[in-house]
Amino acid sequence: MSPFAPFDAQTQVLLIDDDPHLRQALRQTLDLAGLKVATLDDARQLDTAQCKDWPGVVVSDIRMPGIDGMELLRQLHEQDADLPVILITGHGDVPLAVQAMRGGAYDFLEKPFPSDALLDSVRRALEVRRLVLENRTLRLALAERHELHGRLIGRSAGMQRLREQVGSLAAIQADVLVLGETGAGKEVVARALHDLSSRRDGPFVAINAGALAESVVESELFGHEAGAFTGAQKRRIGKFEYANGGTLFLDEIESMSLDVQVKLLRLLQERVVERLGSNQLIPLDIRIIAATKEDLRQAADQGRFRADLYYRLNVASLRIPPLRERGEDIPLLFRHFAEAGAMRHGLTPRELDAGQSARLLAYDWPGNVRELQNAAERFALGLGLSLDDGVLPDAADEPHNLSAKVEAFERSLIAAELERPHNSLRSVAEALGIPRKTLHDKLRKHGLPFNTPGENPPDDGE
């Protein structure tokens, strides 16, 4: 017996009863009331896994062969605990119906019952269902909004606009072009678009076209058959095919050769992929999110990028503002990354003083969020407020030479270990992997007191 799935948006009432005369009479009543009805004579035909978020009502007899109304109620509520189920009982089945109500049934009707009683119960159940699903939608929207705030951090107008755009584009299936400088967070945006979409349970495949050698880029993206070229000893599934059913994030798309761009354009238009060495077209159900740090329009004008591919990609685009355009977000982001870094290493979070905060805002951040994250994590480790290109201006309290940096790092590690729960110098020394006397010498050198009741300095011979 093949499963029957009437759980579509058009069906309002699913009626299940093994008595053909009663089933026909009840259907006629519901039809005349303008309700869209589907009927079954056996609950075993039903695919209950499809009922989640269905906007309708189930009306079922309790006494049926195979799966009775009580078992059906249990199976439906395993999938959606709020689905309204109205049970029909015969004379003498009232105790069973009361048990069903306690088990989550919406209502029960004792035979014989007037048509108005059925219609009234169904209409009330439909209204309750509408409100439940509306509430679910609102809660989901709030949860997604909260998740977006956690991923795309910032109070600036640019970030607020970006979050709104991501939320809107996540709900549709269109391919997206993400524009942003190096380190701006293009993959973070792409991942958010995937995770908030209907494809969230499918694969998310990220590939950087700029990191692929010209000789392997086509094989990596489109795949190949055994013998397609020298060295192709077995079939390879390409990234596009691997991402089928999900999302493929293609970064640095501007680095692709014109020949590969032609193949990508065909894939975007026809939604098929052809492995190297094969004539078979493989259908794809895929969303492509491309990203670039360049002006593709200018690249197209210069002949470095296909104009038709640019126009095909630029239907839906997002621009991530560089960090220098959203200075108000810098302290917030720095604190977020510094606290995360401290937590990861088991350290107590450090606080920026006013001077350090001012230096953060004065810096241009050419590496954007990636550079800021690196600086914040170094700060969390006690390595000072420095960048890849050197110490920030006015950071006179930070070490400049290698020896001083090593000393500062050693001090930060010991200080961090001292903040952990220890009851003796010996346990601290063991945690650091050094003798207790060495630890005592370093505590004295770095000015780090450690006072434990009964703890005495080690003897020279220890």
From Swiss-Prot:
Q: What are the record's GO terms for cellular component?
A: protein-DNA complex
**Residues of the Sigma-54 factor interaction domain:** 152-381
Response regulatory domain residues are 12-126
SUPFAM superfamilies in the record? CheY-like, Homeodomain-like, P-loop containing nucleoside triphosphate hydrolases
- Residue positions of the PTM 4-aspartylphosphate? D61
The answer to whether keyword Transcription regulation applies is: yes
Q: Which residues bind ATP?
A: 180-187, 243-252
Entry PTM: Phosphorylated by DctB.
One Pfam family of this chain: HTH_50
Q: Which GO terms describe its biological process?
A: phosphorelay signal transduction system; positive regulation of DNA-templated transcription; positive regulation of organic acid transport
Q: Per its database record, what is this protein's job?
A: Member of the two-component regulatory system DctB/DctD, which regulates C4-dicarboxylate transport via regulation of expression of the dctPQM operon and dctA.
What name has this protein been given in UniProt? C4-dicarboxylate transport transcriptional regulatory protein DctD
- Organism equals Pseudomonas aeruginosa (strain ATCC 15692 / DSM 22644 / CIP 104116 / JCM 14847 / LMG 12228 / 1C / PRS 101 / PAO1)
Gene responsible for this protein = dctD
